Amino acid sequence: MRIFAVFIFMTYWHLLNAFTVTVPKDLYVVEYGSNMTIECKFPVEKQLDLAALIVYWEMEDKNIIQFVHGEEDLKVQHSSYRQRARLLKDQLSLGNAALQITDVKLQDAGVYRCMISYGGADYKRITVKVNAPYNKINQRILVVDPVTSEHELTCQAEGYPKAEVIWTSSDHQVLSGKTTTTNSKREEKLFNVTSTLRINTTTNEIFYCTFRRLDPEENHTAELVIPELPLAHPPNERTHLVILGAILLCLGVALTFIFRLRKGRMMDVKKCGIQDTNSKKQSDTHLEET
């Protein structure tokens, strides 16, 4: 505010010099997270004399740029603009005091003042509005009850200002969903809007969730297509391995049993053969004695 008071004095002091600052636009509407450049024009004849130029940019009570006699003083820059705001010095020779702000925040909205002294002095106001659209909509579809084919549809997005969510079917019927609004964890002023719809439906049916914001008026819509119901017990690689292991185990047990059974039979046959031989020998011996 002290800088602004000094410039008012300088403006009246140099009125006779007819030094005038102009602005190509006095209103900028920019998107959250984007980069913006706002401009103030001042008269330059022939070659620019940096030693005679003073440029100030401020927003309400925040100092953004203080450029005096060819040097920029970053020590006075407000902390919220550090590493984000800069004066485009290559534009000064063209009579353009352009302020560039990167990664625009919601708190960057407000009234900016450019104050320029160059032989004379003048200032202009520029209004900046920040728009945070609900254009990145996350969606989810869950099966609540496979028997009744009840599904839970969810849409979630962040933006500013607040928005309502309207659910519609493919035949444009408006449906009743439940919407909750909380503050975003990314930035204090952003709203996190989540809406849920529970409905009995069938495969390939289409539903729409629309985020409607009134000021400024803007709509963003996401399409949700109902997928096929999953199998009650979907096969997977682990199941296949378990089944294969069980089959191999059973096969191993069966082969072992068969092998032992055959071995036992062979032993019985061999024993029978030995017994027959012994019996025959005993018979022959008995005959010889007789």
Curated annotation (Swiss-Prot):
It is linked to Truncation of the 3'-untranslated (3'-UTR) region of CD274 transcripts leads to elevated expression of CD274 in multiple cancers including T-cell leukemia, diffuse large B-cell lymphoma and stomach adenocarcinoma. Disruption of 3'-UTR region is caused by structural variants that stabilize CD274 transcripts, leading to overexpression. Increased expression in tumors promotes immune evasion and tumor cell growth by allowing malignant cells to escape destruction by the immune system. This is Programmed cell death 1 ligand 1. Glycans are attached at N35, N192, N200, N219. GO terms for molecular function: receptor ligand activity; transcription coactivator activity. Residues 19-127 form the Ig-like V-type domain. It is a single-pass type I membrane protein. GO terms for biological process: adaptive immune response; cell surface receptor signaling pathway; cellular response to lipopolysaccharide; immune response; negative regulation of activated T cell proliferation; negative regulation of CD4-positive, alpha-beta T cell proliferation; negative regulation of CD8-positive, alpha-beta T cell activation; negative regulation of interleukin-10 production. The lineage of its organism: Eukaryota, Metazoa, Chordata, Craniata, Vertebrata. One of its GO terms (cellular component) is external side of plasma membrane.
